[in-house]
Amino acid sequence: MIIRSLLDTDLYKFTMMQVVLHHFPGAHVEYRFKCRNAGVDLVPFIEEIRAEIRHLCTLRFTDTELDYLRGMRFIKSDFVDFLGLFHLNEKYIDVRPAPSNDGQIEIVIAGPWLHTIMFEVPVLAIVNEVFFSRTQTHPQWEEGKRRLTDKLASLKRPGLEDCRIADYGTRRRFSHTWHEHVLLETHAQLGAQYAGTSNVYFAMKHGMTPLGTMAHEYLQACQALGPRLRDSQTFALETWAKEYRGDLGIALSDTYGFDAFLRDFDMFFCKLFDGVRHDSGDPFEWGERMLKHYDDMRAEPKSKALIFSDSLDMPKVIGLYERFHGRCKLAFGVGTNLTNDLGYTPLQIVIKIVRCNGQPVAKLSDAPEKTMCDDPAYLTYLKQVFGVQ
């Protein structure tokens, strides 16, 4: 079986789930799957994907895993007690061929947010591993190792000693086994330049630092949960601050486009949050504008962190490091390029929240192709409310 532990997911699923438990326990949501690769036929793998999901729904947290979570300073004891009773339920997820008959599949996850939030990452990892295990029966392990060695060597150049990367690649990894190899090799080769991993299972198993705060789904759901739509981003950040009281202080900047984020991210938030994460649009322009915004808001840029996580490879990491090093704190989250580069075209697959409490929700990304919404009229209205062209 592909997923062997409920910890085999990203840390931010736990940090968001805790907010859901304490602030939105009655929220209902719907997620949908999308494969952005043209011509990929996933239909032949449906039964195997279903079988893997069936197994996923039998898993429970072990006492050792619960003790590990309890040891995190920002995880509260009542949340761990809840996780002790938690398991994923098959009735909330449906996998079927798409009506278009073009090889696409539909994965619909619908139910209480508290009981569905944990599906996304392991289900994407399942789709990836099933697909590659069936289409690449003799993987090019040596080519993958060569590519990884070259990437890590590029970060060992003089002048890059403070350039640190983290693994954000669980959802689109080639396989569980390859993911673990990549992490161990990266840790061994980079030492202090390896910041940690978003994967909680591997962090626990290998004594690495687990990393993550919030994802777009949290800010999107707040469109339906806050007092009014225009204030939903502010509401999401304020609710986060109420829950974590200054901990986990990295805000995500592109749910409504960067211009709208800067309007909402006022002096209070600039001083309260430790930094901001970039996930779409030109990262160099974004970084310059963010540092200027900190200056304008009288927040010392050198005390703040810029986190880059959008489709990074090593040349882009190095370029960003050279541009911003010394001007602020820096961190880089590398995903697919780290955990799924054996020479094959990776799957561009996502599972996105599309509804909350029966209302459509959407992301107005700085990369238009990342926008995903099943209600065009709502998308138009959302753009109007947030002043997005």
UniProtKB/Swiss-Prot annotation:
Cellular component terms (Gene Ontology): cytosol
Biological processes, Gene Ontology terms: NAD biosynthetic process via the salvage pathway
Group of enzyme by EC: ligase
Keyword terms of this UniProt record: Ligase, Phosphoprotein, Pyridine nucleotide biosynthesis
Reaction it catalyzes: nicotinate + 5-phospho-alpha-D-ribose 1-diphosphate + ATP + H2O = nicotinate beta-D-ribonucleotide + ADP + phosphate + diphosphate
Post-translational modification: Transiently phosphorylated on a His residue during the reaction cycle. Phosphorylation strongly increases the affinity for substrates and increases the rate of nicotinate D-ribonucleotide production. Dephosphorylation regenerates the low-affinity form of the enzyme, leading to product release.
Positions bearing Phosphohistidine: H216
CDD domains in the record: PncB_like
EC number: 6.3.4.21
Pathway, per record: Cofactor biosynthesis; NAD(+) biosynthesis; nicotinate D-ribonucleotide from nicotinate: step 1/1
GO molecular-function terms, A-Z: nicotinate phosphoribosyltransferase activity
Cited function: Catalyzes the synthesis of beta-nicotinate D-ribonucleotide from nicotinate and 5-phospho-D-ribose 1-phosphate at the expense of ATP.
Family the UniProt entry places it in: Belongs to the NAPRTase family.
PANTHER family the UniProt entry points to: NICOTINATE PHOSPHORIBOSYLTRANSFERASE
Name this polypeptide is given: Nicotinate phosphoribosyltransferase
Source organism: Ralstonia pickettii (strain 12J)
Highest classification ranks of the organism: Bacteria, Pseudomonadati, Pseudomonadota, Betaproteobacteria, Burkholderiales
Gene behind this protein: pncB
